[in-house]
């Protein structure tokens, strides 16, 4: 069965689509859906496949695009990867079964430069990167949007769990209805111009509803497992990627207590992140955690759990999605990790310098991660965010990172 359904199967699919609030023109383009060409970014997973099948079923002129991002043996065959061999094949089979055009674009060189090399360099500098945000920020929501426009599309749709709403001052980004699947943390860097062109038709669904749609359309990926966060890291061994991309760049050094005592040695700061407890390989009586990393001195600084607490976060490369410019002292809610809920904070604004002052201390906030802003009045609305460069205050003092060079 495909999305070219007839009789009872089509009636059942139409009923499900209606119950899920997806009937008619879920992209909000107006007019006849068939007059609108929509590029769908297809990773080969169930979410993007359902997005493409749904829009095709509703009559939009769908063009599926899958990016070939990397090609190394273990990742090509591993379960839970995306944009590699099996996933490209799955995306192509979905498109063929549904009857819409599908293209595979070779972005491997661009992905290596913008994501993989940046991933390695970030670890070497003592930061903890989020490659999925960089991929969205550069490859998917910059380069691919340009390609979509060249293909004559009026918008690009993805299978992300996030909501785009037309507000009084333009398009707004909002958290997904399913808090457990919400991907707003990874999409904070989406710009106003990109948001105008993007659509997220699954944003108000949960995963069970998405899989129900996949089954109604008869998609071969209906039971496919979700993709993992870092698609290009085989078996979760990110250190292997860093050493392959930058051979010999990681230096051994000392593990130092916050009180100045040298407790042991390590094989490179790339093996550690702020908040880490396991794998320190030092014999001490009390539990110790990584408090900060000094890449210039090749030091891993450790301390008791209370030394992890901070209350001030310095940021760079801020993307602001609010209606008005950020004001000094403005209340917001922020997420400092994807799995943590938004917490109360205030912005400290001095010209182009913006810091976040938390209402309560947070532990394990790592430079290199994202700090994402949400409205204090409506915490579902995403106001943007920035990259964490350093932290201070609380019981933990400063955990800024000294850059190499």
From Swiss-Prot:
Enumerate the residues marked as the site Interaction with tRNA.
Answer: 160, 369
Keyword entries, A-Z: ATP-binding, Cytoplasm, Disulfide bond, Nucleotide-binding, RNA-binding, Transferase, tRNA processing, tRNA-binding
Note whether tRNA-binding occurs among the keywords.
Answer: yes
What is annotated as the active site? 135, 231
Kindly list the positions annotated as binding ATP: 41-48, 67, 159
Cysteines engaged in disulfide bonds, as pairs? 135-231
Which catalysed reactions does the entry list for this protein?
A: S-sulfanyl-L-cysteinyl-[protein] + uridine(34) in tRNA + AH2 + ATP = 2-thiouridine(34) in tRNA + L-cysteinyl-[protein] + A + AMP + diphosphate + H(+)
The principal location of this protein is cytoplasm
The enzyme's first-digit EC class, named in words, is transferase
Q: Which SUPFAM superfamilies match?
A: Adenine nucleotide alpha hydrolases-like
Q: Where in the cell is it found?
A: Cytoplasm
**Pfam families xref list:** tRNA_Me_trans, tRNA_Me_trans_C, tRNA_Me_trans_M
* Chain segments carrying region Interaction with tRNA: 181-183
EC annotation from Swiss-Prot or TrEMBL: 2.8.1.13
> Which Gene Ontology biological process is one annotated for this entry?
tRNA wobble position uridine thiolation
Q: Name one GO molecular function term.
A: ATP binding
Q: Which GO terms describe its cellular component?
A: cytoplasm
The record describes the protein's role as: Catalyzes the 2-thiolation of uridine at the wobble position (U34) of tRNA, leading to the formation of s(2)U34.
Identify its protein family: Belongs to the MnmA/TRMU family.
**What is the designated name of this protein?**
tRNA-specific 2-thiouridylase MnmA
């Amino acid at each position: 069965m495909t999305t070219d359904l007839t009789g009872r199967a089509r009636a059942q699919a139409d009923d499900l689509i209606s119950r899920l609030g997806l009937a008619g023109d879920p992209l909000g383009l107006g007019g006849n859906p068939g007059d609108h060409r929509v590029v769908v970014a297809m990773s080969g997973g169930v979410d993007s496949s359902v997005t493409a099948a749904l829009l095709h079923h509703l009559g939009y002129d769908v063009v599926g695009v899958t990016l070939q991002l990397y090609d190394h043996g273990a990742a090509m065959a591993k379960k839970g990867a995306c944009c590699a061999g099996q996933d490209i094949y799955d995306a192509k089979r979905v498109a063929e079964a549904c009857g819409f055009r599908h293209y595979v674009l070779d972005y491997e060189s661009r992905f290596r430069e913008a994501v993989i090399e940046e991933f390695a360099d970030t670890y070497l500098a003592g930061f903890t990167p989020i490659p999925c945000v960089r991929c969205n920020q550069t490859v998917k929501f910059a380069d691919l949007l340009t390609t979509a426009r060249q293909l004559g599309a009026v918008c690009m749709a993805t299978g992300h769990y996030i909501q785009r709403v037309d507000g009084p001052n333009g398009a707004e980004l909002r958290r997904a209805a399913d808090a457990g699947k919400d991907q707003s943390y990874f999409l904070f860097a989406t710009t106003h111009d990109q948001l105008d062109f993007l659509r997220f038709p699954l944003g108000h669904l949960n995963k069970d509803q998405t899989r129900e749609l996949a089954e109604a359309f008869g998609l071969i990926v209906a039971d496919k497992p979700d993709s993992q966060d870092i698609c290009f890291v085989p078996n979760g061994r990110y250190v292997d990627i860093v050493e392959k991309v930058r051979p010999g760049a990681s230096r051994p050094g000392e593990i130092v207590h916050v009180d100045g005592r040298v407790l042991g040695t390590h094989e490179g700061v790339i093996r550690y992140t702020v908040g880490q407890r396991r794998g320190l390989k030092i014999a001490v009586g009390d539990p110790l955690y990584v408090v900060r990393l000094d890449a210039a001195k090749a030091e891993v600084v450790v301390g008791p759990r209370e030394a992890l607490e901070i209350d001030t976060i310095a940021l760079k490369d801020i993307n602001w999605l609010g209606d008005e410019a950020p004001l000094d002292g403005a209340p917001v809610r922020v997420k400092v990790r994807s799995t943590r809920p938004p917490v109360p904070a205030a912005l400290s604004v001095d010209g182009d310098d913006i810091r976040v002052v938390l209402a309560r201390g947070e532990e394990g906030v790592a430079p290199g991660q994202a700090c994402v802003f949400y409205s204090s009045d409506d915490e579902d609305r995403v106001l943007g965010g920035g990259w964490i460069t350093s932290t201070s205050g609380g019981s933990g003092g400063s955990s800024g990172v000294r850059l190499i060079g």
